């Protein structure tokens, strides 16, 4: 058969075994992402529904999935890269000490433009994170999307945004899921990187997160952008 064309009507035993084996190695990826990863790696070429059936029969899939509310989903989706940059702050617990992770995510490509882990995250720290993101893409004039945290409502931050040639919009306090892309990213990072990696120091955490973000940006296929990597999407290689 043509190995590049997914089949849905029959599977050979070796293909079923390969699917199950691949799932055990990548249990956090989800069956759809695994389908495209297996195609990319020339393991098997079958449809997502076939992968779902094989994994369901093997008892490997959860029977439920949490549906996200569409209510207050916020802004229209960006049509181009560097149109929307989402910024958010999250806590990282490293051996009982809390540090601050601030990430900047491109809304179109899901690419992590910049991130920093710091011992404090005042308004001036957030400015520095955004400034370094801008230095990577000097021509970008994104709309910055944030929540209503004190760093983002400060007068100095508003002035920084104006001087930098960017614009800023804050999510509704009642519908913070408008910044859900970045909140999901932070949840994924903690679940797949920080907690399993159990870093023992701030420096170790920084190295661990840096390595994971490189994998996420350059290797991991993203379901929301058509199962290409964020870097492929950012650089126009999705077709």
Locate the predicted segments by residue.
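C-terminal domain-tail junction helix/linker
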Residues: 5, 162-164, 188-239
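Acidic/histidine-rich, metal-coordinating catalytic segments
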Residues: 139-154, 228-231
